[in-house]
């Protein structure tokens, strides 16, 4: 059959051969063009999918702008921890020492005058003698046994300082009134029930400061 086709091709006029050759060449070009077009479309589609995948992917923290950077968690925790940190002991001491400074001007003057008399005048000597006798006669506790064993000058100084602390605790704030005075005593009452020596000293401070409180 192939020989018959070849024989027919040989017998075919030359102009017809040219037409067939041109047609065959055109078909080959059209086929090659379609293949290139399909390949180009496929490449574009792949590039599009790759681009979409990149845009949809997560961005690493290092590529974020500075104003959108992720917060540093350890610093946040450290800040929260510092906000809940307990006050230092020295801060508590300073707060107690400044209680008397918060009183009204008149009460502050009377309070400082009273404290000065305790440290320098006969009132202080009378106070420490009264406190010593009351502590000596009270029910024995570790603190009540320790105070009589102190050297006399040290014991007197300790009792005066404890009295001053209670005076500044009771007389503070904007013009202390009798109801405030009573309320402050009630605040410290649970503590005084456990510390009997402090209760005796506070009661003497109460007695000394009563005239400062305004009705």
From Swiss-Prot:
Main localization (coarse): host cell
Cited InterPro entries: Paramyxo_C
Key words of the record: Host cytoplasm, Host-virus interaction, Inhibition of host innate immune response by virus, Inhibition of host interferon signaling pathway by virus, Inhibition of host STAT1 by virus, Inhibition of host STAT2 by virus, Interferon antiviral system evasion, Viral immunoevasion
Compartment(s): Host cytoplasm
Family to which this protein belongs: Belongs to the respirovirus protein C family.
Subunit relationships: The different isoforms interact (via C-terminus) with unphosphorylated and phosphorylated human STAT1 (via N-terminus), favoring the formation of parallel STAT1 homodimers. The different isoforms do not interact with host STAT2. C protein interacts with L protein; this interaction has an inhibitory effect on viral transcription and replication.
Biased composition (Polar residues): 51-65
UniProt keyword rRNA processing present: no
Region entry Involved in self-degradation and in host STAT1 degradation, spans: 15-22
GO cellular component, one term: host cell cytoplasm
Cited function: The different products prevent the establishment of cellular antiviral state by blocking the interferon-alpha/beta (IFN-alpha/beta) and IFN-gamma signaling pathways. They inhibit IFN-alpha/beta induced tyrosine phosphorylation of STAT1 and STAT2. Blocking the IFN-alpha/beta pathway requires binding to STAT1 in the cytoplasm. They inhibit IFN-gamma induced serine phosphorylation of STAT1. Block the IFN-gamma pathway by binding to and stabilizing the parallel form of the STAT1 dimer, further inducing high-molecular-weight complex formation and inhibition of transcription by IFN-gamma.
Region (Disordered): 12-34, 51-71
Source organism of this protein record: Sendai virus (strain Fushimi) (SeV)
Protein name: Protein C'
Comment, domains: The disordered region at the N-terminus is involved in C protein self-degradation in trans. This self-degradation of C protein may play a role in the regulation of viral RNA synthesis. The disordered region at the N-terminus is also involved in the host STAT1 degradation in order to counteract the host innate antiviral response.
Record PTM: Y1 and Y2 proteins are produced not only by alternative initiation, but also by proteolytic cleavage of C'. Only alternative initiation is detected in vitro, whereas in vivo cleavage seems to be predominant.
A Pfam short name: Paramyxo_C
GO BP annotations listed: symbiont-mediated suppression of host innate immune response; symbiont-mediated suppression of host JAK-STAT cascade via inhibition of STAT1 activity; symbiont-mediated suppression of host JAK-STAT cascade via inhibition of STAT2 activity; symbiont-mediated suppression of host type I interferon-mediated signaling pathway
Anything else known: The C protein is found in virion at a ratio of approximately 40 molecules per virion, presumably associated with the nucleocapsid.
């Amino acid at each position: 059959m192939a020989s018959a086709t070849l024989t027919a091709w040989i017998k075919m006029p030359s102009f017809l051969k040219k037409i067939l050759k041109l047609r065959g060449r055109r078909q080959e070009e059209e086929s090659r063009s379609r293949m290139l077009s399909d390949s180009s479309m496929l490449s574009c589609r792949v590039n599009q999918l790759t681009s979409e995948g990149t845009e949809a992917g997560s961005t690493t923290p290092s590529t974020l702008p500075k104003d959108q950077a992720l917060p540093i968690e350890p610093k946040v925790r450290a800040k929260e921890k510092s906000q809940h940190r307990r006050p230092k002991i020295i801060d508590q001491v300073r707060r107690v020492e400044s209680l008397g400074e918060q009183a009204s001007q008149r009460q502050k003057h009377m309070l400082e005058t009273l404290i000065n008399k305790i440290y320098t005048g006969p009132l202080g000597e009378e106070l420490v003698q009264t406190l010593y006798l009351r502590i000596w006669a009270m029910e024995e506790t570790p603190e009540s046994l320790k105070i009589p064993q102190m050297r006399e000058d040290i014991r007197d100084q300790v009792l005066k300082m404890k009295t001053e602390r209670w005076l500044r605790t009771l007389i503070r704030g904007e013009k202390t009134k009798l109801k405030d005075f009573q309320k402050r005593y009630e605040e410290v009452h649970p503590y005084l029930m456990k510390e009997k020596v402090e209760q005796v000293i506070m009661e003497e401070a109460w007695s000394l400061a009563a005239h400062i409180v305004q009705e």
